[in-house]
């Protein structure tokens, strides 16, 4: 079969994805069991990043593996409407291109523009997913704002509302002044920041005394309605029930006792601002305190702020501090590091505000979702995430689901303007169900994007309709996602699946880590260290990029990505291509024949044994999502065992004529066929292209739907594996001595061996093979070790020597080895010094410490080897 001289990845990519689609290869076919999976829908706001690429590649490995295992396999793609993010991007675009703000459009006009934008970017996302060779069923593609998904969202909302699990109330919520919307607690990112702690004097009524209060936010004092102390704090027991005067404002404040107060914070006396702090809000509820809002939705002081009205919160802070100083009411200020909440989208500092919002009661929904994980009905990979999930679920709080946006699922609630009745319905309400009035106004807010995403595993399958897909493919088998959305998404899907389907949404959850740069830094625009998957695909090819990500995807560890790794696995693809060329060029006069044990040579039995062991190990790894281990084993088998050993061992036989050539042709084709099948989930393009060229009987027109190789116990030869391993070790020993002595590997040398115990004749039996692999003139027996020879191999029965006098200048080599030993000695000293430094071991990057330990062990081994070699030739 004709095969090009060079591996050209993009030619294969353009050819095979199209052919797979034309052949409906991605659609489920009846099979033995099923495997279903839904893609975590990428946001439509831009390009897929390297973390998305990792996520898609890992899913595709499992999908292709299960498809080849004969299961009815479906992978449902889709995109997320990404409420806040999309609206933010479209608003920026309109401001830049049209010079207009959202408010310059009607809601309908803005939504039409956003839909056009969304459809354009959904297409971009599709092309990027295709570029990764993802075998998703495009005929089942969904979007979180599809009409069908909107029906699902409305049905869930109405159902939860009717059960009293969705309610509306005025509570302290997280407000983002930039995005102009509420955020759920888990959408707020906290970071430790340096700030100030201001100590303010609050005068006591009818006395010359005052009490000092410490605060990080003096601007909120305008909304203070009490001071509080801990009831057990002896310092302030006499103040409980007294009245203080609010500086600048003059409002009277009761001094109350509440166990929430931390006696170690500041002075032990705290200001209570129930409208601007969630903890103060709770204190306010317990003590029936007035709630005075003084900051508006633009983060400016409102009309309740007196002379500070209209000022930005931070400007107001400066002015208030100045005024406190003028009045002699600022005792001191201190540097203070504290946790500050930021919007996860735009990084603006969150403002806690008292607002009327919609919430979901989570405790009742969490009960079953806790139980299925406790009972291991849902398994987490790595397992440690089970504990993280459960700890969060035990402490779950109600979820604020309303967002002050236009883009999203509008809340299905209509307020009657005549009688005030709240109409909640799946269908649009035309008249009030209570009074019949047609004067209705729909709630302006939309639902949190995660609300629709929480329904993804069953809404994508057609729910609330009872579709065939829903019956067949729910629950799904696997969810692959980033650990950072375990609470945003994973937990909520489990809760909603249990609630509305009466069953978990998936069996297994695989959580991958962040992709960082090679130094372990988070990828970011500011550092300029991001890796664009499309750029590296363009440079190296899809298959090498996929294989690189697979190898790096160790469970439970952040992925450190060195761009050089892509080049390493591009070389692997070249190796596969060149090996295939060699095999196909040596298929002249090939005939399929039944392989009999008596016809097989030791190297044949060894490679068949190694192949079957590899099939077994890789299959086990893929069953438990050890993608990296499966990829590494596959790499090692193909490059080291098949190419470097078996193909090398077989070359003379392939150049022969007769039965032995036919045997080796059949063995090599059998092994190559299975190897390409094993390779397919990781490197689909090159494996499909090369498999098509193999002159074998095929069980399928396309490799994508061919059978996964099965473990065959009759092709396991333990004795042959043991003996050939000794041959490999002996040959490697000879190669190592040649390398250390600067003797070219292809230079033929004489080798001697001495029998130590008479029970092993593996050298004599495999003499020709050893001479061929090690480039030897001859390997012959000796009674004594030759002078000035290096020991290449030792075991319990034999010693192998290379007499070096004929091949090297002994004196020159002694000098060279002495210098190398001196260098190694210094390296060992340096590594030991580093590892005995407690500071280095405890504070350095763990990977750096581990690498230093490995370098030390390697250097010590090398030192011992060279020392022995020097001794032998001296």
UniProtKB/Swiss-Prot annotation:
Location of the motif 'KMSKS' region: 522-526
GO terms for MF: aminoacyl-tRNA deacylase activity; ATP binding; valine-tRNA ligase activity
Domain of life of the native organism: Bacteria
Any one Gene Ontology BP term: valyl-tRNA aminoacylation
Main location: cytoplasm
Catalyzed reactions: tRNA(Val) + L-valine + ATP = L-valyl-tRNA(Val) + AMP + diphosphate
Record: residues binding ATP: 525
Sequence motif 'HIGH' region, residues: 42-52
Keyword match Cytoplasm: yes
Listed GO CC annotations: cytosol
Compartments in which it is found: Cytoplasm
Disulfide bonds, paired cysteine numbers: none
Record's keyword terms, sorted: Aminoacyl-tRNA synthetase, ATP-binding, Coiled coil, Cytoplasm, Ligase, Nucleotide-binding, Protein biosynthesis
Enzyme Commission identifier(s): 6.1.1.9
This protein's name: Valine--tRNA ligase
Species the sequence originates in: Petrotoga mobilis (strain DSM 10674 / SJ95)
Lineage, top ranks: Bacteria, Thermotogati, Thermotogota, Thermotogae, Petrotogales
